């Protein structure tokens, strides 16, 4: 198991942090604004 070998630990940690950061950036810039826009539009339509 490479997770337990100290030589690979920093590589796995760096890759994990990088992957989570990219995923968080993608979700925050593309997915959340579209979902928020959809929810606001639905609320406006319901209130009409």
Swiss-Prot record:
Would you say which domain of life the source belongs to?
A: Eukaryota
The GO molecular function terms of this record are: proton transmembrane transporter activity
Q: Where are the transmembrane segments?
A: 12-32
- How does the protein associate with the membrane? Single-pass membrane protein
Annotated Gene Ontology cellular component terms = mitochondrial membrane; proton-transporting ATP synthase complex
What broad class describes the main subcellular location of this protein? mitochondrion
InterPro entries hit by this protein? ATP_synth_su8_fun (IPR009230)
What subcellular compartments does it reside in? Mitochondrion membrane
Q: Which Pfam families match?
A: Fun_ATP-synt_8
Keywords in UniProt for this one? ATP synthesis, CF(0), Hydrogen ion transport, Ion transport, Membrane, Mitochondrion, Transmembrane, Transmembrane helix, Transport
One Gene Ontology term from the biological process aspect of the record: proton motive force-driven ATP synthesis
General function of this protein: Mitochondrial membrane ATP synthase (F(1)F(0) ATP synthase or Complex V) produces ATP from ADP in the presence of a proton gradient across the membrane which is generated by electron transport complexes of the respiratory chain. F-type ATPases consist of two structural domains, F(1) - containing the extramembraneous catalytic core and F(0) - containing the membrane proton channel, linked together by a central stalk and a peripheral stalk. During catalysis, ATP synthesis in the catalytic domain of F(1) is coupled via a rotary mechanism of the central stalk subunits to proton translocation.
Q: What subunit structure does UniProt give?
A: F-type ATPases have 2 components, CF(1) - the catalytic core - and CF(0) - the membrane proton channel.
Protein name (Swiss-Prot/TrEMBL): ATP synthase protein 8
């Amino acid at each position: 198991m490479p997770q337990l070998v100290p030589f690979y630990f920093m590589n796995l940690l760096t890759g994990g942090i990088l992957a989570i950061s990219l995923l968080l950036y993608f979700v925050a810039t593309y997915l959340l604004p579209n979902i928020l826009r959809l929810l606001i539009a639905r609320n406006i339509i319901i209130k009409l």
